[in-house]
């Protein structure tokens, strides 16, 4: 399944942050002059020229515009230091829809968030809407070139590596089920890198409000992968209706 990115620059490069040189490459891939690109980006040609030469930094606002104008992947959106925050179900649904998740396609809008930041926000949530939880494994499948170093580091800082490991394992199983062997191998390698930091402490997959009775039931009825990652969840790859690519 396509990620919904048709521009030829998408076939040339997947970038995790926007630099002046990458803006220049994107502009040339679009066969645009500096003047044409500047007009579309809402800046002066002189300013764009300085950015492309590295004399001015790419601001977050310009990076966001570039993602829309050049149609580069959302993984190009700038990342900052992670801060825990409370997001409601509507936020996650809208952002997933904007990133192309089929289950929330009807919410597709123009505002996007870097998928790695969205995934971290979700993994750090105490409670998520079940439909959002089911969508998490889609993010590593649709955006395999996300910034794994940033994600892993922040997951460990927040003690969320078990949640991350389980979600990536679900994505790996989905890739295997879909016959995408190369992606399956890449995701398996990501899971393996998380193994040494696996926590013994029991956790939920973003369902902290579940009752003690539910917790007791899940200890006996969870998939092996959930047990391995010490998570109380019955989510399995068979339940993921919209993750196949």
Residue ranges of predicted features:
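Mid-protein regulatory/catalytic core that forms ligand/cofactor-binding pockets
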Residues: 2-10, 105-197
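N-terminal flexible/basic segments that precede or flank functional cores
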Residues: 1-18, 25, 214-228, 234-235
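DNA major-groove recognition helix of helix-turn-helix/homeodomain DNA-binding modules
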Residues: 42, 61-76
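Short basic helix-loop element that most often maps to the first helix and adjoining turn
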Residues: 21-40
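Short, charged recognition helix plus adjacent turn
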Residues: 78-106, 236
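Recognition helix of helix-turn-helix/homeodomain-like DNA-binding domains
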Residues: 41-57, 77-81
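Charge-dense, extended regions
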Residues: 183-245
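Helix-turn-helix DNA-binding elements, focusing on the entry/boundary residues of the two helices
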Residues: 23, 34, 45, 60-63
């Amino acid at each position: 399944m396509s990620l919904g990115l048709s521009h030829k620059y998408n076939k040339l490069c997947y970038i995790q942050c926007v630099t002046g040189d990458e803006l220049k490459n994107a502009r040339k891939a679009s066969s645009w002059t500096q003047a044409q690109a500047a007009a579309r980006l809402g800046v002066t040609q002189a300013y764009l020229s300085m950015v492309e030469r590295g004399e001015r930094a790419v601001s977050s606002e310009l990076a966001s515009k570039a993602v829309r104008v050049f149609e580069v992947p959302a993984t190009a959106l700038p990342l900052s230091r992670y801060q825990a925050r409370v997001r409601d179900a509507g936020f996650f649904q809208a952002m997933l829809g904007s990133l192309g998740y089929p289950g929330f396609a009807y919410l597709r809008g123009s505002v996007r968030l870097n998928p790695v930041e969205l995934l971290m926000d979700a993994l750090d949530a105490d409670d998520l809407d079940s439909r959002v939880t089911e969508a998490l494994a889609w993010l590593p499948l649709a955006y395999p070139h996300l910034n794994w170093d940033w994600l892993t580091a922040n997951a460990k800082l927040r003690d969320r590596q078990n949640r991350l490991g389980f979600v990536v394992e679900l994505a790996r199983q989905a890739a295997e089920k879909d016959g995408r062997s190369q992606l399956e191998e890449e995701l398996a390698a990501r899971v393996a890198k998380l193994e040494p930091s696996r926590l013994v402490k029991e956790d939920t997959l973003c369902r902290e409000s579940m009752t003690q009775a539910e917790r007791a039931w899940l200890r006996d009825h969870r998939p092996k992968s959930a047990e391995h990652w010490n998570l109380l969840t019955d989510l399995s790859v068979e339940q993921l209706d919209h993750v196949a690519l």
